[in-house]
């Protein structure tokens, strides 16, 4: 989280500076990156700090105020993030955490309470966010559940392919929006791939994620 926030701060000056389209004797045309206003961040429970900081940090750096609401499974993350920014010296009133149910969230969006909405979560919930914002001209950014494929081609290193793709599918118990959800394997390698993948997964041990013996 610190690394991501620091990187975004480091690149902010270059990323936010005006883009000069034309500078001639007749015209100066430029694109200015101005704050949007109040950015509403709806963060998920998986990777709760990282997924939130991905929007919270750049929104604040760009001069916006931020309202954060977290998934019901990770409510305290929002409180702790606001506390951390406050202790770091962020002026009061620029970053707030709210506990909201789905109906209230959709009502605030539909009422035009925010200038931009960023949502990370399921496709179904993202559809409701989009519908709530319809007609308000509020910008909406949606990062929804993916259907990410993996491909194993003719010249693939089979052991490396198995290790990489199975890790991509199982990492964080598969609770990742960019996790591998299906794999396409060239016919010649298919049987060997399945056998190696099954053998690898059979070695996994389910259990308490805080215990080292758990895969």
Q: How should each PLM-predicted stretch be described?
A:
Residues 116, 124-215:
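ALDH superfamily catalytic-core signature
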Residues 1, 20-26, 211-215:
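Short linear capping/connector segments at secondary-structure termini
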Residues 8, 88, 200-204:
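Short alpha-helical functional segments enriched in proximate histidine and acidic residues
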Residues 17-160:
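Rossmann-like NAD(P) dinucleotide-binding subdomain of oxidoreductase/dehydrogenase enzymes
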Residues 1-16:
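Long amphipathic alpha-helix in the N-terminal Rossmann-like dinucleotide-binding domain
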